[in-house]
């Protein structure tokens, strides 16, 4: 089945995007990415060495260049200015790489997005030619404004970053999905495989996760589980679920031609 995720004009066979933080080491990171089947790998410029620290292990040494599209992100930024500066640095480090994830946080205790600063940063970055995938709240009005600015993917949270609480407001996600003409990728809050499957069944174009895999007892096995969940959820969405019924059950077996126990 030819069902590709398309972001900024590039096609991807996998709809699972995976982060690189919180793993035991880069070897475990690489193993989890491998079994996840992901093609888009995100890394926090402020926390992961991508070449800015010459004396430390470099994540890029563990990632095959021809397999993954790197998605530098601005995790840890609390203002538009910080986020813009961070992604300009990423562009320098990565030879004019412009495929980026914008996130501007509002509170260090809950990591909820600051949508005002996010909108400000998005305007500048899009004007500078970046392909911006943007982390935001599940507010459909904000999502529409980010799309109008020119962001190439909208990434609403399912619940708070790192919470593992799953999808708390499927109705808002549905509104964003229905109005958007760019991919909608759930970002933050996924805790286990069923959360990923539900996101895909709702009609999301993809799911991004990090802690759900890295904080599992067996991250590599969980990465494989997430691969299967995203694929199953997408297939179920395309297949179309049966309608829900209340007190009007229809038997799965036909009633015609059955053997009757009534004596004539």
UniProtKB/Swiss-Prot annotation:
EC nos: 2.8.1.10
UniProt KW keywords: Cytoplasm, Schiff base, Thiamine biosynthesis, Transferase
UniProt keyword annotation of Acetylation present: no
Domain of life of the source: Bacteria
GO molecular-function terms, A-Z: thiazole synthase activity
InterPro entries per record: Aldolase_TIM (IPR013785), Thiazole_synthase_ThiG (IPR033983), ThiG (IPR008867)
Gene Ontology process terms (BP): thiamine diphosphate biosynthetic process
SUPFAM superfamilies: ThiG-like
Primary residence: cytoplasm
Functional pathway: Cofactor biosynthesis; thiamine diphosphate biosynthesis
Active site residues according to the UniProt entry: 101
GO CC annotation: cytoplasm
Compartments, record wording: Cytoplasm
Catalytic activities: [ThiS sulfur-carrier protein]-C-terminal-Gly-aminoethanethioate + 2-iminoacetate + 1-deoxy-D-xylulose 5-phosphate = [ThiS sulfur-carrier protein]-C-terminal Gly-Gly + 2-[(2R,5Z)-2-carboxy-4-methylthiazol-5(2H)-ylidene]ethyl phosphate + 2 H2O + H(+)
Residues annotated for 1-deoxy-D-xylulose 5-phosphate binding in this entry: 162, 188-189, 210-211
Role played: Catalyzes the rearrangement of 1-deoxy-D-xylulose 5-phosphate (DXP) to produce the thiazole phosphate moiety of thiamine. Sulfur is provided by the thiocarboxylate moiety of the carrier protein ThiS. In vitro, sulfur can be provided by H(2)S.
Similarity field: Belongs to the ThiG family.
Summary of subunit composition and partner proteins: Homotetramer. Forms heterodimers with either ThiH or ThiS.
Name of the protein this chain belongs to: Thiazole synthase
Species of provenance: Chromobacterium violaceum (strain ATCC 12472 / DSM 30191 / JCM 1249 / CCUG 213 / NBRC 12614 / NCIMB 9131 / NCTC 9757 / MK)
């Amino acid at each position: 089945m030819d069902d590709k995720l398309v972001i900024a004009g590039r096609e991807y066979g996998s709809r699972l995007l995976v982060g690189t933080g919180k793993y035991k080491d880069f070897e475990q990171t690489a193993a989890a990415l491998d079994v996840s089947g992901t093609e888009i790998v995100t890394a926090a410029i402020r926390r992961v060495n991508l070449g800015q620290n010459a004396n430390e292990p470099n994540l890029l040494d563990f990632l095959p260049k021809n397999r993954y599209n790197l998605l530098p992100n601005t995790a840890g930024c609390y203002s538009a200015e910080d986020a813009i500066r961070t992604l300009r640095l990423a562009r320098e480090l990565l030879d004019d790489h412009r495929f980026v994830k914008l996130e501007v946080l509002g509170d260090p205790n809950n990591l909820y997005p600051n949508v005002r600063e996010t909108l400000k940063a998005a305007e500048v970055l899009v004007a500078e030619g970046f392909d911006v995938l943007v982390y935001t709240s599940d507010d459909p009005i904000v999502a529409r404004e980010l799309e109008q600015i020119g962001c190439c993917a909208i990434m609403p949270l399912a619940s708070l970053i790192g919470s593992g609480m799953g999808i708390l407001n499927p109705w808002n996600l549905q509104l964003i999905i229905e109005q958007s003409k760019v991919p909608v990728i759930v970002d933050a809050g996924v805790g286990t495989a069923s959360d990923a499957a539900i996101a895909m069944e709702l009609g999301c174009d993809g799911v991004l996760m990090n802690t759900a895999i890295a904080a599992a007892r067996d991250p590599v096995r969980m990465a494989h589980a997430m691969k299967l969940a995203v694929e199953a959820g997408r297939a179920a969405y395309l297949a179309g679920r049966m309608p829900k019924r209340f007190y009007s059950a229809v038997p799965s077996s036909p009633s015609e031609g059955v053997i009757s126990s009534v004596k004539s």
